[in-house]
Amino acid sequence: KSKQTKSQVNNASSQLYTDQKESGEWEAHVLSSNYMYTLVNESRPFYVETEMLASTSFPLRQRREISLAAGFSWRGEGNEGRGRDFDRQRPPSTSIRPRSFREIPSLHTFGGFIEATYRTPNLHVEAGLRNQGLKSRDYALIYQTEPRLNLLWSLCSSPSGYTLSLKAGVGWISFMPTLEKLYPEAIYNDKVSFYYNDSNESGNTLGILTTHAPGMERNMKLKPTVNRKIEVGLIGKTPAIRLDMTVFFEKQTDGFSSSAQYIPFSYREYDYLSTAQLRPEYKDGQVWVNGKAVPYQEKYSYTPVSVPVNTLHRKKHGIEMVADLGTFSPLRTSLIVDGIWLYVREKNTALNGIWPIQYTDKTEYPYVGFYDRQGGPGNESRSEIISTNFRFITRIPRIGLVTTLTWQMIWLYKYRTLYNGSTGENVWPLYWCGTDGIIHPFTEAQKEDPAFAPLLSTTAPERFLPNSYKPYGMLNIRVNKAFGEHITLAFFANNLADLRPTRYSASTRSYLQQNTQPFFGLELQIKL
């Protein structure tokens, strides 16, 4: 059990608050302009897990061997804590609601695998199959099967220590949706329908809020994100150096993203009362003054809701390299160089609503457009990078000192935003909806209708220009000093030379500063 309490002064003008979690019109708490609040979070997590493993091996002739392994694991977890709570007269903000962890059902995750390994003096092959799943009270079983195959083949070797090996691999790895995606925070939209505050008489106030509570917007069709990767490489060794190079291709499907939806609702807006010493009251679902119902207008608005979706798709390919150039004896310094060339294409196919917040004669714009792009200028990006790290490691065992000097270089960096493979300066929505909530395809005729003109999404042409930065680098250092077998003191400094060059971004027409500011630190490690 744990509790966290915070106190803070709220310096805001008088506000209205309700803790109602259902849609409707409610009499609100009128908050004072300055108050202290206390926010309590009580968590009582629990979990139960079990795991079973089994393995065996079968020696064969000529130093060959086959080994088998299998396993299963299960974990159940939940939380019985009261969660987030506070004094309703002193809320941390006017948009927050209490939320108990008990509202979130227990989560059950499981995984099983089977693996076979074949070994010879020159060949090592691993083949496996893994299945992982997730189950909760409100969701059907979410699961994914992940095959993989790895190979290491010694092509040639010599007694003097020269070897060349081929490595290859193919496999899947999946990522289950998190608890926050399965059970997101419920959405509440509070509109002020009526507010009266008699400045001449303390306590003569009345506030009415209309709450629109679409609730917890869950996506019952949420799937795991799946990464598929293929790689092939060579490993070469000599008595002095080791070189490892890998070519890879990776494809991600059903990546997690969010889709912005807009749900319409209606609310009352009562006439404003400016006369002092009135006694408004709320009864029978209506505001009354001196026995007369206060007139109101019926208005419409939208509540934005973010729904988790599987719409992110990413492709990567590149070359990785690690070279251990050995130790230079006079200096007792070894040099390790690693680098990568990486090209990434990413596209998000989520359908997102955009509501132009325009007011005409104090009336909110009645239409929402739905576009095949996020809030930015496009829906896909392409990037390319070439980088290397040079690590100089100096060891002085006699005094227990290890110094690591790292020179990081970005030789090439390119980035570009696109809209469906091209530019998208002027984009009309694919769909639209009005205050009735019915979604319609957007037609050519509506492009000519002035009523729909605010739905045209415009973007400056330069936002789609490619960005390309000149090389830049950074120098880091780390010094470790051992005091006996149990104590190690480390000093580190990042961006030691304060290299912070600026590079011009064509898409934003601005200069961006690269690298972080220099920072230093000490670490103390004690082993008992």
Task: Locate the predicted segments by residue.
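Structural signature of Gram-negative outer-membrane beta-barrels, strongest in the C-terminal barrel
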Residues: E65-S67, S73-E77, S100-R242, T246-K251
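Hydrophobic, lipid-facing positions within transmembrane beta-strands of outer-membrane proteins
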Residues: F46-M52, H108-I114, L129-G133, T145-L151, ...
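Transmembrane beta-strands of outer-membrane beta-barrel pores
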Residues: S2-K6, F58, W74-E80, T120-N122, ...
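Extracellular loop and loop/strand-boundary signature of outer-membrane beta-barrel proteins
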Residues: S33-E42, S93-E103, Q132-Y139, M216-M220, ...
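C-terminal beta-signal and adjacent terminal beta-strands/loops
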Residues: Q408-A460, Y469-Y472, R478-L528
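Face-selective signature of the C-terminal outer-membrane beta-barrel domain
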Residues: K1-A140, G318
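Transmembrane beta-strands of outer-membrane beta-barrel proteins
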Residues: T50, I66-F72, L123-L129, P147, ...
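Gram-negative outer-membrane beta-barrel transporters
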Residues: L60, R119-V125, F249-K251, R268-Y419
